Amino acid sequence: MAQAQFRDYVRLVRGFNTFTRMVHCDCINGYAVGRKVSLGKVTGDLAITIFVNKKLGLRRLPLPNRIPKTIRLPSEKAKDGVLEFITDVREARFSSLEYIARERPAPSGISIGHVNITAGTLGGLVRDRESGDTVILSNNHVLADSNEAAIGDPILQPGPYDGGTDPADHIANLTRFVPIDFAADAENRVDAAIATPLNPNNVIWNTKDIGPETPATVRHLGESDLGRFVHKTGRTTEHTQGFVDAVFATVQVKYDLFQKATFVDQIIISQSPAEEAFSDGGDSGSLVYDSDNSSVGLLFAGSEGTEDEPATTIVNPMNYVLEKLNIELLSSGDHPSS
């Protein structure tokens, strides 16, 4: 029965033209068969996942553009002559270059990197409490080349791997970083750095696919937050969703063939089997938010999935990032505008 139901869903999704005419909406970017997500949690129900530019309330949508909660189609094999399909609408825009291109002003969630690395993600904008400047936040290994950089080094957007060159794409200078201690008995809490834009008008307080960055709120995670919905936008996997799998984690992170570092009090993010991996290489530096868009932490590492285990993502708790770098979140009244 379950396999037959799944095949019915696949047949409907493959009928792309028929389905497009059915919903009469040119803002749809794609379809898939997945599990229904309700309140940020994956349910056991199969659903037609419909990717749209932006989810809007019914009152803001013309009648022909409204996607029904269920789709009913006549079928001779159904007992009552009708097959019913659940729908699940999600926001997603698919583009091969959007997150690795040069952008001015540069939003968060796109390619950036120290002149000597490959590329990571521009996490967000914060305030440097020492200078009062609005600065770019990302990882040490993205902006400071894993301790190898010098203060004042050029930061490129996009990162070198994505075609960024100096001086054409020089967007900021390295300001400060928290050194990563690779000693066997050391305990690290953050992989973090900041850079000051050459021109404040070249950055914007906005995260791709999420919108204006969160007001000055930080989500401190505890036991009650296990399973909490989170999301991020990164250079490689773009906008993804996941959930808090574990907290207060101690992990060993490999930086190259010879260097490993231990991190404590970390957050582990996973995702349901129906979802793509929460992160991949190049997403380092992404800011992770909860459903209220409160800051959860700074993404910096992860593991690949296997047949039996999902991929996982490691996140520095945001309170440690703010403390160690001596920075603070921007408030809604003082962000750079586009």
Predicted regions and their residues:
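Serine endopeptidase catalytic core focused on the charge-relay Asp
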Residues: 97-272, 276, 281, 289-292, ...
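C-terminal subregion of chymotrypsin/trypsin-like serine protease catalytic domains
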Residues: 269-270, 277-279, 289-338
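A generic structural signal for short hydrophobic patches within well-formed alpha-helices
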Residues: 57, 143, 318-321
